[in-house]
């Protein structure tokens, strides 16, 4: 009997334990990182960033057909199952406005797509959506573009735009006469470099990693922290979203802590959001959520742009 990971979305391909043999066939370089658990089952050392990156390569190749994927050293290596959950729950939200059917040609904007390009890769493979990914960092942008260029078919489904103004979110990215069914975002969580380092250190201790061990909790400044932390970033996003109220059906963003929700709800009320939705998610013991808001009523959202 195959054990299931509790809480993951019913359509998530990662509900069952990893079949390491199948993953190694899809990505032979994973084989070098396979270790045995105390129960004698094959696994990887999740405190080893190279092992985690190899596992991600294998997952993306095996489940999503992404054969060319890499990220530069020091960038975030995302947990694929949790990222996939956001995509699937967003699909459910869009289906509610489409007579219960997930729209196959949805257009989605991924804010801060990152060097890993994880949300567009999953969204294109699972639902055939078309993505625009924004990115502020030059190296992250180049990495994401290399992934697009290296995989057949992605150049028609994913386009990237460089956000040249670090203080802007939608400004300069959503062009005049463009429209999107939804936006996505995994915002920076910490409010300073110091708290980001402390958070990485806590995770490292939880895995029993030596103090001088390589971090699997990498990340560039813009990936991990911003002035004012997550709440300030999302409040800025909410304020800017009002400017594009007629061009986007649903604005969405992850919110790492439930404690951060009250000020965000107040900000959404202040800008006149017509409807606000919270989608709860869970990956094992970890609880997460995203909020979605719109300036369109139900009838308008159900019409095509």
UniProtKB/Swiss-Prot annotation:
Is Transmembrane helix included in the keywords of this UniProt record?
Answer: no
Q: Name one GO molecular function term.
A: 23S rRNA (adenine(1618)-N(6))-methyltransferase activity
Give the CC-aspect GO terms. cytoplasm
Lineage, top-rank taxon, reads Bacteria
- Where located? Cytoplasm
Taking the record's annotation, the residue ranges forming a coiled coil are none
Q: Which GO terms describe its biological process?
A: rRNA base methylation
Q: Which UniProt keywords apply?
A: Cytoplasm, Methyltransferase, rRNA processing, S-adenosyl-L-methionine, Transferase
Q: Which reactions does this protein catalyse?
A: adenosine(1618) in 23S rRNA + S-adenosyl-L-methionine = N(6)-methyladenosine(1618) in 23S rRNA + S-adenosyl-L-homocysteine + H(+)
Q: SUPFAM superfamilies from the entry? A: S-adenosyl-L-methionine-dependent methyltransferases
Q: Which residues form the signal peptide?
A: none
EC number, UniProt record: 2.1.1.181
Family stated for the protein in its record: Belongs to the methyltransferase superfamily. METTL16/RlmF family.
Q: What does this protein do?
A: Specifically methylates the adenine in position 1618 of 23S rRNA.
Write down the PANTHER family for this protein, in alphabetical order. Answer: RNA N6-ADENOSINE-METHYLTRANSFERASE METTL16 (PTHR13393:SF0), SAM-DEPENDENT METHYLTRANSFERASE (PTHR13393)
Q: Which NCBIfam families match?
A: PRK11727.1
What name has this protein been given in UniProt?
A: Ribosomal RNA large subunit methyltransferase F
Q: Which organism is it from?
A: Enterobacter sp. (strain 638)
Which taxonomic lineage does the organism of this UniProt entry have? Bacteria, Pseudomonadati, Pseudomonadota, Gammaproteobacteria, Enterobacterales
